[in-house]
Amino acid sequence: MSFVVTIPEALAAVATDLAGIGSTIGTANAAAAVPTTTVLAAAADEVSAAMAALFSGHAQAYQALSAQAALFHEQFVRALTAGAGSYAAAEAASAAPLEGVLDVINAPALALLGRPLIGNGANGAPGTGANGGDGGILIGNGGAGGSGAAGMPGGNGGAAGLFGNGGAGGAGGNVASGTAGFGGAGGAGGLLYGAGGAGGAGGRAGGGVGGIGGAGGAGGNGGLLFGAGGAGGVGGLAADAGDGGAGGDGGLFFGVGGAGGAGGTGTNVTGGAGGAGGNGGLLFGAGGVGGVGGDGVAFLGTAPGGPGGAGGAGGLFGVGGAGGAGGIGLVGNGGAGGSGGSALLWGDGGAGGAGGVGSTTGGAGGAGGNAGLLVGAGGAGGAGALGGGATGVGGAGGNGGTAGLLFGAGGAGGFGFGGAGGAGGLGGKAGLIGDGGDGGAGGNGTGAKGGDGGAGGGAILVGNGGNGGNAGSGTPNGSAGTGGAGGLLGKNGMNGLP
């Protein structure tokens, strides 16, 4: 027995497009009819007359064939339009009877378990902070959590059934002063398959220097077997901003970790920290990226930027997530970049996040994640950020991650930056076969000492050592990084330039 799956709206759209194509071709044929079917002879001789008659005959034959094709095209469009209407009518006619059948199927499960077999969970009402309802036991998405009242948390998203996606968490309630509500957690994905729900955003707080923003809700975990984790919620804006929520973990067999939520913007105390990325599926899956740290804008005082979130760990076969960038400190220090996530067995480590620019001290770059135990390259360290002015201090670059034991190159160290130049990060160590990572360059000082270059990572068996990072210029210059030792079959890395 064969089955047909169709979408009436798509069929109707295709029929409309085909009708437009037919109209365009018909217009072109009509415009070409007169000049091509009445070709004049080039001269009065018999050959010219015969050639003109030949070309005119071909054009007349084409016009006759085009008329037949236009008729067929019109009939086809009519049939397609009628089919779309028939499918739509059949859907409308069957909706009410099937809904009654579904109610009969769900009634015993609702009576015994308070949950249907098939169907989506109800959404929480806005402003109540009510949790979203769970989806059907067999098939169904979880309902979204309701947003919180003023200063109250948002509701959690409902969990899915065997198949389905988790519901999103509700947003925390905003307040004019005081502490805002935190975001609700996202619901878990289906037991067999489904994505976790996103965490709700933290509430915003006013009230000048005393307001505290709500933290973003954590993302829901992916399905137990397959599914991506939900993203963490964004932290709320306030004088003391809320942190971003952590991303949910991926499914057991396969799934990508959810991204961490961004930290909220801080207006006086500090920017919120970025949420950590969720871990990838235990077997296959990449770790989620860390959330970006919130900026410190300091309308009323000083406020450093928030640190970036760490990247999630990869699965047995998967890469680590990148660390989040640190927040900018407009009147304060920049936030540190988050560290990259490490892989477990076979895969590359995640890159470290860049530090946030600061008006005083720049944020340090995050360390690169380590590669899988056997095979993979270490993640690159994040770049340190610029510190403001001649008295500022640049952030140090993050260290590169270590490679896998058997194969892989070490990660490169991050670059430092000035005021007083930040030091370059160390290059990561290589595996048995692979090159060491290069050290990061030191930052140039602005009326201050330059940053030292990072040392190159060493190789073990087959591979070259990483080059040392160049010294940053300044008063005085920084020291150059030393090259890493080469393997038994390899060269030593070059020292950095002074």
Curated annotation (Swiss-Prot):
Pfam families: PE, PGRS. It is found in: Secreted, Cell wall; Cell surface; Cell outer membrane. Binding of Ca(2+) to PE_PGRS33 induces conformational changes and increases affinity for TLR2. Coiled coil: none annotated. Its main location: secreted. GO terms for biological process: adhesion of symbiont to host cell; response to oxygen levels; response to starvation; symbiont-mediated perturbation of host innate immune response. GO terms for molecular function: host cell surface receptor binding. PE domain induces protective cellular immune response and PGRS domain induces humoral immune response during infection in mice, suggesting that this protein is a promising candidate for the development of M.tuberculosis vaccines. Immunization of mice with the PE_PGRS33 protein stimulated CD4(+) and CD8(+) T-cell proliferation as well as IFN-gamma secretion, supporting the potential use of PE_PGRS33 as a vaccine candidate for tuberculosis. InterPro entries: PE-PGRS_N, PGRS_rpt. Residues 140-260 are annotated as: Interacts with TLR2. Residues 1-93 form the PE domain. Induces TNF-alpha release through human Toll-like receptor 2 (TLR2) signaling pathway, leading to macrophage apoptosis. The signaling pathway involves TLR2-dependent activation of the mitogen-activated protein kinase kinase kinase 5 (ASK1), which activates the p38 and JNK MAPKs, leading to enhanced expression of TNF-alpha and tumor necrosis factor receptor superfamily member 1A (TNFRI) genes. Signals are amplified through classical caspase 8-dependent mitochondrial release of cytochrome c, leading to the activation of caspases 9 and 3. Belongs to the mycobacterial PE family. PGRS subfamily. Expression of this gene in M.smegmatis leads to low levels of NO and IL-12, increased level of IL-10 and better survival of recombinant strains in macrophages. This is PE-PGRS family protein PE_PGRS33. The gene is PE_PGRS33.
